[in-house]
């Protein structure tokens, strides 16, 4: 039976690992054992940071867009909400490059001046006018025209409070309302919980 030698395969395997460990400090680039340990650890770091890099760049883009929006007197949330309403399909990477490289970046985006008006909350006040109630005056035939007393016409107008759609409001606006209506622990609640708490508070005031 012929003798089998694994020397060539073992040599290729070790040579491959040492090639991947080229440039490492000390024995991590020369000895196979320590080089293999460091290469395995480096591959784990590379796998983890391929995911982490996407998160880090998103944070960087948001901070740059926010800085550019503050120069125009806007907030990041208002800007992104306004761009969605105006159907401007520009991603955060491009917006961050505009804010970082060009002066007055956000102003160059289309419809930004219109967005400031559209994104500001402007509740529409709806007033329902009731028909005028005219108090009829009874005139007596015996009295003359000079002595007639007519009661003034009275109009009763009840203005309803504007019906706010709480679900369409932003989170910081809901927190302001919750602070005004003294909702307990509103800063710890989520958006849906704040909406339900505000509805209960408004219902109590109406009653």
Swiss-Prot record:
Domain of life: Bacteria
Disulfide bonds: none
GO MF annotation, one: rRNA binding
Residue ranges, compositional bias (Basic and acidic residues): 140-149
Entry-linked Pfam families: Rho_N, Ribosomal_L20
GO BP of this protein: DNA-templated transcription termination; ribosomal large subunit assembly; translation
GO cellular component, one term: ribonucleoprotein complex
Residue numbers spanned by region Disordered: 117-161
Keyword terms: Ribonucleoprotein, Ribosomal protein, RNA-binding, rRNA-binding
This protein's record includes keyword RNA-binding: yes
General function of this protein: Binds directly to 23S ribosomal RNA and is necessary for the in vitro assembly process of the 50S ribosomal subunit. It is not involved in the protein synthesizing functions of that subunit.
Family according to the record: Belongs to the bacterial ribosomal protein bL20 family.
The protein's name: Large ribosomal subunit protein bL20
């Amino acid at each position: 039976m012929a003798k089998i030698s694994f020397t060539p395969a073992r040599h290729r395997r070790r040579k491959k690992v040492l090639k991947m460990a080229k440039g490492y400090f000390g024995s991590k680039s020369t000895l196979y054992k320590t080089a293999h340990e460091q290469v395995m650890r480096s591959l784990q770091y590379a796998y983890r940071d391929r995911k982490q890099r996407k998160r880090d760049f998103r944070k960087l883009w948001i901070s740059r867009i926010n800085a550019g929006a503050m120069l125009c007197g806007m907030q990041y949330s208002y800007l992104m909400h306004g761009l969605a309403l105006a159907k401007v399909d520009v991603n955060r990477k491009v917006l961050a490059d505009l804010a970082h490289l060009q002066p007055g970046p956000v102003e160059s985006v289309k419809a930004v001046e219109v967005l400031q008006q559209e994104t500001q909350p402007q509740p529409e006040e709806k007033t329902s006018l009731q028909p005028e109630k005219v108090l009829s005056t009874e005139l007596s035939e015996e009295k003359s025209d000079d002595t007639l007393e007519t009661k003034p016409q009275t109009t009763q107008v009840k203005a309803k409070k504007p019906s706010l759609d709480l679900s369409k409001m932003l989170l910081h606006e809901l927190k302001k309302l919750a602070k005004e209506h003294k909702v307990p622990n509103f800063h710890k609640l989520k958006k849906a919980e704040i909406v339900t708490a505000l509805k209960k508070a408004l219902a109590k005031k109406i009653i």
